[in-house]
Every structure is written in C-alpha cells, then in structure tokens.
C-alpha cells in the first residue's frame, strides 16, 4: 500500500514538473501558432497573416507574395495535414491543394505544399516552403518563359517581389499553362 501511494505521489510530481518546466506547453503553443499560421495563410487575408510574420524578416515578403499567388491561383485545400515537429526542431505543415495551374495541365495530380516553420523565442522566425510539383509543372513554366515572353516581361516581371501583381501574374501563367497543354496535346504528347 505504501509503495502504491509513493508511485502515485511520484507520478503527480513528475507530471507537475513536466508542466512547470514549460516543455510540453511550449511545444503545444508552438504547434498552435503553426496551425494559426496555416489558417491565416489560407484565409487569403494578408491582414490576418502579416502579424504572424512580424519576426520572420527574411521570409515575410515571400510568404505574403505566395499567399496572394495562392489566392489568385484559386488554391483549394484538399487535405490539411497536421503540423508536426521535425527532428531538427522545426515544424512542418503539409497541405495538399488543388490549383488552377495544375488543373490546366490535366494530370489529375494534387500538389502537397509543405511549410517548414522555424521558431525563435516562441515567435515565427522563418518559413520555408516546398512542394512535390510534377516535372510537367516546371516544363510548362519554362515553356511560358520561352513562348509567352510578354507574360514574363509585364505582369510577372517582378515575380516573387511585388505582392500587388501576384494574382495577376498567376492568372497570366494559368493562361500560359493552358496554352502549353494545348501545344503538347496538338503534337500528340499529352
């Protein structure tokens, strides 16, 4: 009986110390902040996203551009994976989307964009993005650059620099991707 009481008391003390040292609540708070970032990003409202990027000096502009690009490209979340810590201490949030550019290529593929968030002193310090775009996506982009230079010289001239032009740029790229698909379909390659 005494042993059982000691085990219960020890368990209570250990549980209390885990919460007192802040380890678990910090992880939970960071994951909550990462999920809030994803909510804000896909709200397509920059005024919700910008405050979360206050300390992300090196990536804030590109993330705000990407948000405007995603809105202009009609990104639709198809599967929202939960944000999770990596072995490197960052948080990864995989989001599978449907978007106009990929739809123009008629592959039936859904792209997963992954946001890797680095926290500094409990604030978002840096965000890197990656995706599993298929090779045809990059082939189409290169085709647009070569065959529709007016797109690259006008609305996409400041690509990834001018948030104000992001939506217009992605819509022009969408037209270019459709033209690319039509060209390979006509040549018997699709």
Question: Model features per residue range: what roles?
Answer:
Residues 8-15:
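Bacterial N-terminal signal peptides
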Residues 1-7:
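Bacterial N-terminal signal peptides that target proteins for export
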Residues 127-190:
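Low-complexity, intrinsically disordered terminal/linker segments enriched in charged
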Residues 53, 95-99, 130-133:
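A mature extracytoplasmic/lumenal domain signature
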Residues 18-43, 186-189:
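Short, low-complexity N-terminal intrinsically disordered segments enriched in polar/charged residues
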Residues 66-118:
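Surface-exposed, charged secondary-structure patches
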Residues 40-59:
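Short, well-ordered alpha-helical segments enriched in acidic and aromatic residues
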């Amino acid at each position: 009986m005494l042993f059982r009481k000691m085990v219960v008391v020890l368990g209570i003390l250990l549980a209390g110390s885990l919460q007192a040292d802040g380890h678990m609540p910090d992880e939970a708070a960071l994951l909550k902040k990462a999920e809030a970032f994803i909510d804000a990003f896909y709200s397509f409202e920059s005024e919700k996203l910008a405050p979360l990027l206050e300390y992300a000096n090196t990536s804030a502009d590109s993330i705000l551009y990407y948000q405007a690009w995603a809105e202009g490209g009609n990104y639709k979340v198809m599967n929202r994976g939960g944000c999770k810590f990596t072995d490197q201490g960052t948080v990864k949030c995989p989001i599978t989307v449907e978007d106009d550019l990929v739809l123009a290529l008629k592959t039936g593929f859904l792209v997963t964009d992954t946001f890797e968030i680095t926290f500094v002193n409990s604030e978002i310090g840096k965000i890197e993005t990656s995706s599993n775009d298929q090779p045809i996506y990059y082939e189409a982009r290169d085709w647009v650059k070569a065959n529709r230079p007016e797109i690259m010289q006008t609305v996409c001239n400041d690509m990834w620099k001018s948030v104000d032009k992001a939506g217009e740029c992605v819509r022009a790229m969408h037209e270019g991707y459709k033209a690319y698909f039509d060209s390979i379909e006509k040549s018997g390659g699709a």
